[in-house]
Amino acid sequence: RFYNRLQTGINDQFLENNDGNGAGIEEMDFGAAKVSVAFMMDPNNEATNNRFALPIRATGIKTLPNGELSVYVTPSAQLKSKNQVTLVEPADQPKGIAVGLYQTVNGALGGNWLLGFKHDKTGDVKNTRVIAQYGSSLTPATALDVVAEYRINTAPNDGGNKWLAIGARTDTHLGGPFRLLFEAGHDQVKPDAGDTRNMTKFTVAAAASAGKDAGSRPTVRLFLTHAIWNEAARQTLSGRTQEVFGDKKSGTSIGIQAETWW
């Protein structure tokens, strides 16, 4: 089932998520690049109406002495047939295409960079994203991660928006399995119809991890987060979040999180 994911470490966001049922060939070495191709489709949704994707990627393209380029191209389309019991044919779905370019730069400004651009289109809905992630060590015991992203979503009937996000985290090894983390982030969403929404969050966490490095896993964190948002953001609250915060424009949460990799 697993094929490929490309994510930002600080906020666990998947820039590319080619994960699903299918088959493919990975990392065919052509010298200048390693090429991977797969056919992905989930036939468990409906017997007569499915959607397939053809993820194609070229990685390890040496564009800089200290950096590499990865290119992702993913076309998608509908596969359908008439239901032989009801004699109803599924409604047409638009074709899709996604193109992503991701450049790594190591050792610049004392750290490692991931610079990305992605554009995808399905019918009348379009998304464009630019992202920069930076990772470094402030001291032998403290790691720093910073991420900034800007998205433009275009959709019919003023259904799109523009989204700016920026955040940073420090992760300090205190001794033994114990760590201390600080995070700060800000999001701004400008919908095509409606007022601009803003939210700023601050988090402090104490953690115990199986290793000295920031990426050591498994880890358990006890965290406290305080967030501040404006009236436009408050009006979008729903469900349990609205039940808890109501007409407030700030709030605090505390929790425990466990994480492991394999």
Pin down the residues of each PLM region.
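Short flexible/disordered coil segments
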Residues: 20-24, 29-32, 179-182, 245-253
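Short amphipathic alpha-helical interaction segments
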Residues: 162, 194-198, 212-214, 246, ...
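Outer membrane beta-barrel
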Residues: 1-73, 199, 203, 221-231
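Outer-membrane beta-barrel "beta-signal"
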Residues: 204, 216, 245-262
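Generic domain-boundary/flexible-linker signal
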Residues: 82, 157, 193, 215-217, ...
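Leucine-rich solenoid repeat modules
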Residues: 198-220, 224, 228-237, 242-243
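Extracellular loop and loop/strand-boundary signature of outer-membrane beta-barrel proteins
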Residues: 7-13, 45, 85-89, 154-156, ...
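Detector for outer-membrane/organellar transmembrane beta-barrel domains
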Residues: 31-36, 51-191, 197-202, 260
